Amino acid sequence: MDKKDVIEFFDRHAPDWDAEMIRNDAVISTILDNANVRAGARVLDVACGTGVLVPDYLARGVASVTGIDISPEMIRIAAGKFPSDKVSFICGDVEEAALDGDYDCIVVYNAFPHFPQPQRLINRLSGLLAPGGTLTVAHGMSRRAIDGHHSG
């Protein structure tokens, strides 16, 4: 899939995304523990979709969350759900967007397979980390489950 196809796919599915979200709170909690998401942290949520992890970040007392997603519809929905000064959303390609950097935690959750050049993404995100910051790439589903989830 090229980026245009990815945008079209996620724009089409955005209205039902939250209802169809397969969520395992224990797995998410462990992922965020390992990502060192903690009070006072600046978090970059890559391919944030409708902001499904934003409540988890806020519950941990983070200083700020920046969500970025290539899908305008996903960002529109996310922005409508979280009217907080601690949360901001950017519609754009994380590999090209102008980002402030110095993030304590960068999380790529349920999205890494959608990036056609993984090393390019890792290099880009690594450059946005604050000293001692963490980059976490995690997925809550198996490859088979992912394929089934995105087959529509």
Task: Pin down the residues of each PLM region.
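Conserved class I S-adenosyl-L-methionine
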Residues: 1-38, 52, 136-152
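Class I SAM-dependent methyltransferase SAM/SAH-binding core
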Residues: 44, 50-96
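A conserved beta-strand element that flanks and buttresses the S-adenosyl-L-methionine
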Residues: 107
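Short catalytic micro-motifs in class I SAM-dependent methyltransferases
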Residues: 110-111
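A short glycine-rich, Lys/Arg-flanked "PGG" loop and its adjoining helix->strand segment in the class I
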Residues: 120-131
